[in-house]
Amino acid sequence: MSPTSFFLLTLLLVLVTEARGARERFSQSAEDPSSSHMGIKIRAGGSGSGSAMEEYSVSENSWSNFKSKHPSSISSESFHEESSSSSEMSSSGGHFGLKMRGSQAGGGMSSFKTRVKSRILK
């Protein structure tokens, strides 16, 4: 067995094992409504300053509840949500804001690049 195929099989095994573990934790919490806190936090891969979505945890019950408790840390996220929803709703000649820009570039990766750029800019 070549080292490349061994590495790929090991990587596949790790990914399948991690996915199964996450699914089991999720199904246990769905079956047991008394466990409202699973200890899950959303974290970004970078070492920069944390955004509001990174600080949000399941214990907050809802995103709107978190926004009401931490209004200063979510100013950029709420602005981005409002601007993207308003640009999608306003149409001029069949063009829909950000979605049209991604489709004009052509190719399937353009929307992915737009999303990555918007996450980096936050």
Curated annotation (Swiss-Prot):
Coiled coil: none annotated. Residues 1-21 form the signal peptide. It comes from the Eukaryota. Pfam families: Svs_4_5_6. Induction: By testosterone. Residues 23-122 are annotated as: Disordered. It is found in: Secreted, Extracellular space. GO terms for cellular component: extracellular region. Residues 27-37 have a biased composition (Polar residues). InterPro entries: Svs4/5/6. Keywords: Secreted, Signal. Testis. Belongs to the SVP2/SVP5/SVP6 family. This is Seminal vesicle secretory protein 5. It comes from Mus musculus (Mouse). The lineage of its organism: Eukaryota, Metazoa, Chordata, Craniata, Vertebrata. The gene is Svs5.
